[in-house]
Regions:
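N-terminal helical cap/lid subdomain that shapes the substrate entry/recognition surface
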Residues: 5-14, 18-103, 108-109
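Conserved Lys-Pro-Asp/Glu-containing loop-to-beta segment of HAD-superfamily phosphomonoesterases
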Residues: 155-190
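Substrate-recognition element of Asp-dependent hydrolases with the DxDx(T/V) motif
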Residues: 17, 29, 105-135, 141-147
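A short, structured active-site edge motif that brings together acidic residues
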Residues: 46-50, 78, 138-153
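Acidic, Mg2+-coordinating phosphoryl-transfer loop and its flanking beta/alpha structural elements
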Residues: 182-224
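Conserved SAM-binding loop
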Residues: 18, 117, 182-183, 225
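Short acidic-hydrophobic, aromatic-tinged amphipathic segments that line or gate anion-handling sites
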Residues: 223-231
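Conserved H-loop
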Residues: 138-142, 174, 223
């Protein structure tokens, strides 16, 4: 008989957790800002905005940076130029430069351990599924909550995470928030998880400085911060090591 994991549901942010987007989303931000302002922005500057919170949406972040450089540009124009670079004319943009940040074998192991895996992301769902299909990952994620389903209640609002739990409950999978973990790389991810009553694991992605990003995520309420998502199978198997003693029999 299958044994139910102590943490049955694992919800993932996509960018910076499952996917290395330093050469795609981050590059699209840089080039779109340059297109409108002629000013160069570095990865460190983008990360500083992210660390302030409230910039989980890269379209909105790009629009804000352009405005901070003194250029008033309609949001729709920013999105058009961003997507022209990121998605491309025929799925031939920077999205093709993305690489997995987690190994397929890790996802397979989590599935074998009995975890239900889901994604809660700010990506449009068509882009999220394109990436999952590209790497053969769709089978691992029966649940995906993308940008379109979040309205004006994106992270750090807990709504997308609670929506994911609601979808599972509607499918007959009754799991309380406190037995669910959200794995994300930003302060908005940690804030959303905390507000939803979920456990939170922060990830320091390759373009972030672990000496500054790890303590920031812990300060915002992450239960644990890791640099390698491939360590997750062992970590979630022993939650008392990082989530207190709430899992004692």
């Amino acid at each position: 008989m299958a044994v139910t994991p102590l943490i049955p549901v694992m919800l993932f942010d996509m960018d910076g957790v499952l996917v290395d987007v330093s050469g795609s989303y981050r590059r699209a931000i840089e080039e779109t800002v340059y297109h409108f302002t002629g000013r160069e922005v570095q990865q460190e500057m983008i990360q500083r905005y992210k660390d302030r919170g409230g910039f989980n949406d890269d379209w909105e972040l790009t629009h804000t940076i352009i405005g901070d450089f003194g250029m008033e540009t309609p949001f729709a124009r920013v999105v058009t130029e961003f997507q022209r670079r990121y998605r491309g004319e025929d799925w031939d943009g920077f999205i093709t430069e993305e690489h997995p940040f987690i190994q397929t074998e890790t996802l397979l192991e989590l599935k074998k351990l009995g975890h239900i895996l889901g994604i809660v992301t700010g990506r449009p769902e068509v882009e999220a599924y394109w990436t999952l299909d590209r790497w053969g990952w769709r089978e691992f994620f029966p649940l995906l909550i993308g940008r379109e389903r979040q309205g004006n209640r994106k992270k750090p609002d807990p709504f997308p995470l609670l929506l994911a739990l609601g979808r599972l409950n509607a499918a007959g999978i009754q799991v309380p928030a406190e037995r669910t973990v959200y794995i994300g790389d930003s302060v908005d991810d940690v804030t959303a998880a905390h507000a939803a009553g979920m456990l939170s694991i922060g990830v320091v992605h390759p373009s972030a400085d672990p000496q500054t990003h790890e303590p920031l995520l812990l300060e915002r309420g992450a239960n644990l911060v890791i640099t390698d998502p491939n360590s997750l199978p062992e970590i979630v198997s022993w939650p008392n090591d990082w989530a207190g003693n709430m899992f004692e029999a």
